[in-house]
A protein has these predicted regions:
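Extracytoplasmic beta-rich repeat domains
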Residues: 37, 116-135, 162-181, 208-223, ...
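Structural signature of WD-repeat beta-propellers
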Residues: 145, 191, 231-232, 276-277, ...
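Short loop/turn segments that connect beta-strands within beta-propeller blades
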Residues: 154-158, 200-203, 240-244, 286-289, ...
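WD40 beta-propeller blade core
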Residues: 151, 197, 237, 282, ...
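Blade/loop signatures of beta-propeller domains
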Residues: 54-72, 79-115
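Bacterial Sec signal peptide processing site at the extreme N-terminus
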Residues: 29-62, 66-68
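Sec-dependent bacterial lipoprotein signal peptides
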Residues: 1-33
Length: 454
């Protein structure tokens, strides 16, 4: 496959490139590829879509066959990419946009320019990586830096307030990881110090705090009167949004070494889907924390210690199905209700997919962006993203898929063909997916610069 080209094809088999570098590890490991896995039978019981969908213009080109991972089925070349109409959104209250980690197709202008840049605190250093996604709630943008400081920004980029959530007995450089979620006018902060803290969104005043006694490297999700979070010891918890009291816990498998990723739970009806560093994806009943079903993203065959890393990306719930991908090379779609597997692909990834209409868009660990047919898991097109193999995203906005890279790039790819038709230079590298709210796209760079585009 030619570098930077978008390709599609006839029915057949094709492979993905080998895993590439650029990932921050908690242990020094060597790179490798996962083994092959057959695709499971297709099921067609996904929920129908209420909104009218319009095929996007653009010519699709055949998917080329590449060496590397196991073959994947290819969708018919004459099958159009269809998207639901873009919807205006004024908030991005969770790391995944919504409590179910699916933002759909959001509205965004066709021509972007940077309108402001702001200092959001301390970025990555030798102590730890900046991994927490910004959020937008009630007209404010909120950022958590690597020193345990939360900053609230106005729509013009000015600082409204900044508070430290570092415990008095801790050094602030140990506060990396964690994340933010908003609900009911409150900002919920999960920290690398092991605390979950509720702040008033308007003033930054601390409302309550809860010590989980274990670092939190992933982001929380707030919904249905609860804050859901997974700590580094593999324990999932549900806390009350009113006072932080513990409602239930669930112990997942413990993984001694993992990638420094930042996933978050997905709420879907009466269950919450928890991603664990072990590669487990477990649906727990919101009422009592009892497991409803379990899926594993871990591969049975691996070629190296890096390939054995099983971290799960942020699961996405859309239309009665859960879409999840793991670093070790497995991507699955299952039903929310009972965890029945719809399809499975050999795709390694640590970035949450974007789901809209009958399309699932995902970038793998080698920098290959692809469109997958939601109903049956067939590949519609693939694109080798330019200049880097380490990408964060995608988010679907204004009919484009937006991603950032470790080389300081912001790119937009046409969702109908995969062609990259927008490339912007950032002030620094970014390892966090863009977010979109109020017709603006926000990027947080690795040096903790918050950039706004409109």
């Amino acid at each position: 496959m030619r570098s930077g080209g978008a390709t599609t094809g006839r029915r057949g088999k094709w492979g993905l490139p080998a895993l590439a570098g650029g990932l921050t590890l908690l242990a020094a490991l060597s790179a490798g590829c996962a083994g092959s896995e057959p695709q499971l039978p297709r099921l067609s019981d996904l929920n129908p879509f209420a909104e009218k969908e319009v095929p996007l213009p653009g010519k699709r080109i055949p998917v080329a066959l590449t060496e590397g991972h196991a073959g994947l089925d290819v969708a018919p070349a004459d099958q159009p990419i269809v998207l639901p109409p873009p919807q205006a959104n004024d908030a991005w209250t969770q790391p995944g946009g919504t409590p179910y980690n699916s933002s759909g197709h959001v509205a965004l202008g066709s021509s972007l320019r940077q309108i402001w840049s702001a200092d959001a605190g301390t970025g990555s250093s030798s102590y730890g990586k900046l991994t927490a996604s910004p959020i937008v709630s009630d007209g404010r943008v909120y950022v958590l830096d690597t020193r345990g400081r939360v900053t609230s920004f106005s729509q013009s980029g000015s600082t409204v307030w900044r508070v430290s959530v570092t415990p008095p007995s801790e050094k602030d450089q140990n506060g990396y990881g964690g994340g933010l979620a908003a609900d009911g006018g409150r900002i919920f902060v999960a920290t690398g110090f092991g605390w979950v803290i509720a702040l008033d969104g308007q003033s930054g005043k601390k409302l309550w705090e809860k010590n989980l006694m274990s670092p939190i490297r992933s982001s929380p999700t707030a919904a249905d009167g609860r804050v859901f979070v997974v700590s580094a010891d593999g324990i999932a918890r549900a806390l009350s949004v009113s006072d932080g009291s513990e409602l239930w816990t669930h112990q997942g498998l413990i993984e001694k070494a993992s990638l420094l990723t930042n996933a978050s739970p997905a709420v879907a009806g009466d269950v919450v889907v928890m991603p664990y560093p072990s590669g487990e994806v477990v649906a727990l009943r919101i009422a009592d924390g009892q497991p409803a079903w379990t899926e594993s993203l871990a591969r049975t065959r691996v070629a190296s210690s890096l390939g054995s890393m099983t971290d799960a990306a942020r699961p996405v719930v859309e239309g009665g199905a859960v879409f999840a991908v793991g670093h070790s090379g497995r991507m699955v779609a299952t039903t929310v209700r009972d965890g029945q597997r719809l399809w499975s692909l050999s795709v390694p990834g640590i970035q949450a997919p974007a789901v809209a209409g009958n399309n699932v868009f995902v970038v793998d660990t080698g920098g290959q962006l692809m469109a997958i047919t939601r109903a049956d898991g067939k590949v519609a097109w693939t694109t080798r993203l330019p200049g880097s193999t380490t990408w964060s995203g995608p988010v679907l906005a204004g009919s484009r898929l937006w991603l950032t890279s470790n080389k300081g790039q912001l790119v937009g790819a046409d969702a109908s063909t995969g062609k990259v038709d927008v490339q912007l230079k950032l002030s620094g590298p970014s390892y966090i997916a863009p977010i979109v709210a109020g017709g603006r796209l926000y990027v947080l760079t690795d040096t903790a610069r918050l950039l706004a585009f409109q």
